[in-house]
Curated annotation (Swiss-Prot):
GO terms for cellular component: extracellular region. The modification Phenylalanine amide is found at F9. The lineage of its organism: Eukaryota, Metazoa, Ecdysozoa, Arthropoda, Crustacea. Belongs to the FARP (FMRFamide related peptide) family. Keywords: Amidation, Neuropeptide, Secreted. This is FMRFamide-like neuropeptide FLP8.
Length: 9
């Protein structure tokens, strides 16, 4: 899981 993915909301 990319923890950076939530920043791309």
């Amino acid at each position: 899981v990319s923890h950076n993915n939530f920043l791309r909301f």
